[in-house]
Regions:
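N-terminal, positively charged nucleic-acid-binding surface of large information/translation enzymes
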Residues: 1-153, 194-207, 211-226, 235, ...
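Conserved active-site neighborhood of enzyme catalytic/cofactor-binding cores
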Residues: 14, 97-99, 108-124, 189-191, ...
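Substrate-binding cleft of carbohydrate-active enzyme catalytic domains
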Residues: 45, 241-246, 250-253, 283, ...
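Short Cys/His-rich metal-coordination motifs, predominantly Zn2+-binding knuckles/fingers
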Residues: 100, 170, 268-269, 339-341
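Short acidic, glycine-rich loop/turn motifs
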Residues: 123-129, 166-171, 338-340
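A glycine-biased structural micro-motif
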Residues: 157-162, 228-240, 248
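Extracellular/luminal Protease-associated
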Residues: 163-218
Length: 516
């Protein structure tokens, strides 16, 4: 099982809060002790569910991603990839959870359709009576605007291209540029570009060498790049205030009520902000080449076969993989910082000090370890060989690597399957598995993803206690057809239990009557 970094930390923090204990007061080491206590008490629930369902496994071989040997492998791989320049630190736009105060993966972001407002705002043209109107759902980000983009084919704005617009209230001028990202059919056709707070805008900013102005603190409040009267306000309070000001200035043209998709953190249920922060990344583009070739050569195949196309689409358009998380529970990144910011990556402090002594020669230095931990998927990506004793050439590794079949859900093909293929092909020069069997997801009776926040979680142990393991197994197997998710409910299990009861009764009748 994996250590589920963010999810586990969130649960333990909530439990401590009930006892009025603040993790920041007890400190990192004490908090990690509390997490281990919770893990020992509750962490084997998944294994218990599998056992009750009747899975026939060698349970003596169970492994955990935070086990000592697994942790050593994680450190070795990080150092090896860093030394090959496949891991690096950079400042990029990431999904930022302002509640948990950490970067999160795309998998942990849920796009919820919500009722929103689209604000049409007039920007004055410098040294002119002309105006250009843009439409945005996030007017508070005006403080970080770097340009206004229009489509090169949109003749309505040809006379304005190259001129400067004045950001209302902010009173800073920005250039009107041409970029194909601007859609003439969307909004007004003119788009405000805020590279520090939107992934698409970030790409436009890079293409056009625009200034990147971050206006948010990590808790979602306006920072010192904001304007007077807004600094320190929560982003949503800033939005309310800026709308009032725009109305008073008579430059808010109109407001449309719309439905749009907004990113939420699946753990915190808070709105996710694209935020420019320093993080650690894996050069996934370089590592993706071998897995693509592995699938093309059919050394690894997908069933159903249609998932092969999805795999190619993901891998051929892969972005750098953000592997750092600003939490305490997980594999702490093996990097040490000197007083001047110089980074030394090593398997332990002693080795880092050797590197630092060599670099600084006779100068004094002090090393402080990176506080971030690794994305849980990083250690999970090493699972096929780390659990078999790698880097030692053990009998288990020779016998079970590559394995024959991996069974998994489609939702983690990219986050887990692809990354296992990356690491296996790079470190062992061979695919970790020959076949990938992609199964359906178990959802609630309405087809919704199960989550504690929705209150729609169905615990298999409760179903087994009420109906027995066989009816639940029969239900899941009967409904698990390729390409269709399982809509699970108690009524479904009741129906299959009743059917099995009839089969059992018929069997008993035959036995009692000595039927052959």
């Amino acid at each position: 099982t994996d250590h589920a970094g963010i999810a586990t930390q969130a649960i333990v923090e909530k439990n401590l809060a009930k006892e009025k204990i603040d993790k920041n007061i007890i400190g990192r080491e004490k908090f990690i002790e509390k997490v281990w206590e919770w893990k020992i008490k509750s962490g084997d629930l998944i294994l218990e569910q599998l056992k009750k369902l009747g899975c026939s496994c060698d349970w003596s071989r169970s492994r955990f991603t935070m086990d000592k040997l697994m942790s050593e492998v994680v450190t070795k791989v990080f150092v090896a990839l860093y030394n090959k320049k496949l891991i690096y630190k950079d400042k990029k736009l990431v999904n930022w959870d302002t509640n948990l105060k950490t970067a999160i993966s795309d998998l942990e972001v849920v796009q919820n359709e919500v009722q929103s407002q689209l604000y049409y705002i007039k920007y004055s043209i410098e040294d002119s009576d002309e105006q250009i109107t843009i439409a945005t759902t996030r007017p508070e980000t005006m403080m970080g605007d770097a340009a206004i983009a229009v489509n090169p084919k949109d003749l309505r704005f040809k006379n304005l291209v190259g001129k400067f617009a004045i950001i209302p209230i902010v009173n800073r001028k920005i250039k009107i540029i041409e970029d194909h990202y601007a859609d003439p059919e969307q909004g007004t056709g003119a788009v405000k570009i805020t590279p520090a707070h939107d992934f698409n805008d970030y790409d436009v900013g890079k293409r056009n060498k625009l200034e990147i102005i971050n206006i948010l603190e990590k808790d979602g409040k306006i920072n010192n790049n904001g304007i007077k009267g807004y600094i320190g306000l929560d982003r949503f309070e800033a939005r309310k205030k800026i709308i009032i000001e725009l109305k008073n200035l008579n430059i808010l043209e109109k407001i449309d009520n719309i439905k749009n998709k907004v990113p939420y953190g699946d753990r915190s249920n808070s709105i996710i902000e694209p935020l420019l922060t320093e993080q650690w990344f894996v050069n996934a583009k370089s590592l993706s080449k071998a897995p693509i070739q592995t699938v093309k050569s059919k050394k690894t195949t997908f069933f159903p076969e249609n998932w092969t196309k999805t795999f190619y689409q993901w891998m051929e358009n892969i972005e750098p993989w953000c592997i750092s998380r600003q939490i305490w529970w997980g594999h702490r990144i093996p990097a040490w910082y000197a007083n001047d910011g110089k980074i030394f990556v090593a398997e332990n402090l002693k080795q880092a000090e050797i590197l630092a002594k060599k670099f600084y020669k006779n100068k004094d230095f002090k090393l402080i370890q990176e506080t971030d931990v690794l994305d849980t998927w990083f250690s999970s990506a090493l699972w096929p060989f780390a659990t078999l004793g790698w880097p030692k050439k053990t009998n288990e590794l020779k016998k079970f690597y590559p394995t024959s079949v991996l069974v998994t859900g489609f939702d983690i093909i990219f986050f887990w399957v692809a990354r296992m293929l990356m690491m296996g092909n790079y470190l062992l020069k061979d695919t970790p598995f020959k076949k990938v069997y992609v199964h359906a997801l178990v959802r609630d009776e309405k087809g919704q993803k199960m989550s504690k926040s929705k209150g729609n979680v169905i615990d298999p142990l409760e179903l087994i206690s009420e109906y027995g393991a066989d009816p639940l197994r029969f239900t899941l197997i009967s409904m698990a057809s390729p390409g269709r998710d399982v809509k699970l409910s108690k009524d479904r299990v009741t129906g299959y239990r009743n059917f099995l009861t009839k089969v059992w009764s018929a069997n008993n009748f035959l036995k009692l009557n000595n039927c052959k």
